[in-house]
Swiss-Prot record:
Gene3D superfamilies: alpha/beta hydrolase (3.40.50.1820). Its main location: cytoplasm. It comes from the Bacteria. PROSITE patterns: LIPASE_GDXG_SER. This is Acetyl esterase. Homodimer. Interacts with MalT and MelA. It comes from Salmonella typhimurium (strain LT2 / SGSC1412 / ATCC 700720). The keyword Cytoplasm applies. Coiled coil: none annotated.
């Protein structure tokens, strides 16, 4: 797609989204485009500090969980002494960036809005860790807390997964992995998915959207995929291209959120249409005027807070529904 033929999304954003795009953090250096991956990870952490400020206070606990790949750091957010369910959160960042600190505010808000314990999983990043390591680490974390629930005052009879962007793929892939491998970690009552990618290699939205403003050009997406996968054959794996998995049965209820001007929006649309066609419980909501990753910006965007509350309401409704 010739860049000039793409939709000029920056002229169509909401006022809130435009304010975020134009916001300049004092003293923040430019993105180190030519830096190595560790330099970019440190920059991402620095840039996200502002957006994670002023988050709700609550009891937190850090725990190193043993997995087949070594210990994985987790952080438990407990808004109240007892919880009706446990929600596992997988952060975004193209599989190569991000950690528990870059998504701290999102997890705190989600814990407050659901009233449930949220467990953030600091899965190993690519390219150092390749598919399916992050999924297997997530499953190992779920198994660990299922076996040690009393020690951490957890309710693991009802669990859920949540994630944004690449984390949304990992959230859904992990739930399907549990189903497909017959691993019991609790009853998965819901999956909360914000602007994920689910396996499309091309789409109308990938042609029309994406640029320097969101880090999701065709070249960017190819780079993330190349860093994450072991080889070309992995592209068709049912836990990477989730449309190659069986989405006709036993898929936990999914809240599928998308951003209007996200090149990945067609992934969310296709996922919703597929689940809906096969009577799998799901809800789809598109947030107008937004770009990919808008969930981070709840300090300046009420719609980001709305999107979190919408997901929380979906999860809470499933806590009350026998499944």
């Amino acid at each position: 797609m010739k860049p000039e033929n793409k939709i000029p999304v920056l002229t169509r954003l909401s006022d809130e989204m435009t304010a975020v795009v134009n916001f300049q953090q004092p003293g923040l250096p430019p993105w180190p485009a030519d830096g190595d991956i560790e330099t970019q990870r440190q920059y991402y952490l620095l840039e996200r500090r502002f957006w994670n400020a002023d988050a709700p206070s609550m009891t937190t606990r850090t725990c190193a969980v043993p997995t087949p790949y070594g210990d994985v750091t987790t952080r438990l957010y407990s808004p109240q002494p007892t919880s009706q369910a446990t929600l596992y959160y997988l952060h975004g960042g193209g599989f190569i960036l991000g950690n528990l600190d870059t998504h701290d505010r999102i997890m705190r808000l989600l814990a407050r809005y659901t009233g449930c314990t949220v467990i953030g999983i600091d899965y190993s990043l690519s390219p150092q860790a390749r598919y399916p390591q992050a999924i297997e680490e997530t499953v190992a974390v779920c198994s660990y807390f299922s076996q040690h629930a009393d020690e951490y005052s957890l309710n693991v009879e009802k669990i859920g997964f949540a994630g944004d962007s690449a984390g949304a793929m990992l959230a859904l892939a992990s739930a399907l992995w549990l189903r497909d491998k017959h691993i019991r970690c609790g009853n998965v009552i819901a999956i909360l998915l914000w602007y994920g990618l689910y396996g499309l290699q091309d789409s109308v939205s990938r042609r029309l959207f994406g640029g320097a403003w969101d880090g999701l050009t065709r070249e960017d997406l190819d780079m993330y995929e190349k860093a994450y996968l072991r080889n070309d054959e992995d592209r068709e794996s049912p836990w990477y291209c989730l449309f190659n998995n069986d989405l006709t049965r036993d898929v936990p209820p999914c809240f599928i959120a998308s951003a209007e001007f996200d090149p990945l929006i067609d992934d969310s649309r296709l996922l919703h249409q597929t689940l809906q066609a096969h009577q799998q419980p799901c809800e789809y909501k598109m947030y107008p005027g937004t770009l990919h990753a808008f969930l981070h910006y709840s300090r300046m965007m009420t719609i980001a807070d709305d999107a979190l509350q919408d997901g929380a309401r979906f999860f809470m409704a499933r806590m009350k529904t026998p499944r």
